[in-house]
């Protein structure tokens, strides 16, 4: 069995970490540098830093905050938000990111995925896919969950793999912040459709949810935010629990 990864997510707005429900009603949770450092100490395998309003505010990512966050980490850092061109990808990598997450721009011009993978390697390119169920179908939404692209999520996942993405960050908007568990059906369908790693995101509320998304949905990694920010689950305890349940994790 491959080693499963636990990823702590920092949703950043105006330089502060925030968290909401279904991408709405954001509350302040702390500053990214100290939280990133804390989660590494607790045993997180990676940190994802998402500048959640960069795209809808039509501005560049917060490169100074990214630089400060990267400077305290020795685990991989993925950065997303406001990434529109291969130059933005380059800037994020130069600021200290190990991987760059592309979301809205990938839908608007899929060549950014292809060009970035060719220039920086697939291992540096993550495509974030935010999904809502609409009339029984899984549909891709962009612009922080505000815009219905009418793209089928499974077809889009296959397409980004073809374009050279090295990983998919899959978020269920319906489950985001609800703490009701990951969308296992959606995650499994995407995992079965591609040959690149899939990070499950949206809905983690208790340790069992991580076990389910690894054992039933076969996700390669599980991302969470609110339950870590609020101290409901400590990453160290989560990894001990998963290890006892037969899931291979880095201790």
UniProtKB/Swiss-Prot annotation:
Lyase recorded as keyword: yes
Pfam families registered for this protein in UniProt: His_biosynth
Family (UniProt): Belongs to the HisA/HisF family.
Gene3D superfamilies in the record: Aldolase class I (3.20.20.70)
NCBIfam families: hisF (TIGR00735)
Catalytic reactions on record: 5-[(5-phospho-1-deoxy-D-ribulos-1-ylimino)methylamino]-1-(5-phospho-beta-D-ribosyl)imidazole-4-carboxamide + L-glutamine = D-erythro-1-(imidazol-4-yl)glycerol 3-phosphate + 5-amino-1-(5-phospho-beta-D-ribosyl)imidazole-4-carboxamide + L-glutamate + H(+)
Pathway assignment: Amino-acid biosynthesis; L-histidine biosynthesis; L-histidine from 5-phospho-alpha-D-ribose 1-diphosphate: step 5/9
One annotated Gene Ontology cellular component of this protein: cytoplasm
Taxonomic placement: Archaea, Thermoproteota, Thermoprotei, Sulfolobales, Sulfolobaceae
Quaternary structure, from the entry: Heterodimer of HisH and HisF.
Catalytic residue positions: 11, 130
Functional description taken from the UniProt entry: IGPS catalyzes the conversion of PRFAR and glutamine to IGP, AICAR and glutamate. The HisF subunit catalyzes the cyclization activity that produces IGP and AICAR from PRFAR using the ammonia provided by the HisH subunit.
Main location: cytoplasm
Subcellular location: Cytoplasm
EC number: 4.3.2.10
Keywords tagged on the record: Amino-acid biosynthesis, Cytoplasm, Histidine biosynthesis, Lyase
Organism: Saccharolobus solfataricus (strain ATCC 35092 / DSM 1617 / JCM 11322 / P2)
One BP term from GO: L-histidine biosynthetic process
GO molecular function: imidazoleglycerol-phosphate synthase activity; lyase activity
Protein name: Imidazole glycerol phosphate synthase subunit HisF
């Amino acid at each position: 069995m491959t080693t499963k990864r636990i990823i702590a997510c920092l949703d950043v707005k105006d330089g502060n970490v925030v968290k909401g429900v279904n991408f709405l009603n954001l509350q302040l949770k702390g500053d990214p540098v100290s939280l990133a450092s804390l989660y590494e100490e607790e045993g997180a395998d990676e940190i994802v830093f998402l500048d959640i309003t960069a795209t809808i505010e039509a501005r560049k990512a917060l490169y100074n905050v990214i630089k400060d966050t990267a400077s305290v980490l020795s685990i991989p850092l993925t950065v997303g938000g406001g990434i529109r061109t291969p130059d933005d990808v380059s800037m994020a990598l130069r600021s200290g990111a190990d991987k760059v997450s592309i979301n809205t721009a990938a839908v608007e011009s899929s060549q950014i995925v292809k060009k970035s993978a060719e220039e920086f390697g697939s291992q540096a390119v993550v495509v974030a896919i935010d999904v809502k169920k609409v009339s029984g179908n899984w549909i891709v939404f962009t612009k922080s969950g505000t815009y219905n692209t009418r793209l089928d999520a499974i077809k889009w996942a296959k397409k980004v793999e073809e374009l050279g993405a090295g990983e998919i960050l899959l978020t269920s908007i319906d489950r985001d912040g609800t703490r009701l568990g990951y969308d296992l059906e959606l995650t499994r369908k995407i995992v079965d459709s591609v040959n690149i790693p899939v990070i499950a995101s949206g809905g983690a509320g208790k340790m069992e949810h991580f076990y389910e998304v690894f054992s039933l949905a076969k996700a390669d990694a599980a991302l969470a935010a609110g339950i870590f920010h609020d101290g409901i689950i400590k990453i160290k305890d989560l990894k001990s629990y998963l290890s006892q349940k037969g899931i291979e994790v880095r201790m």
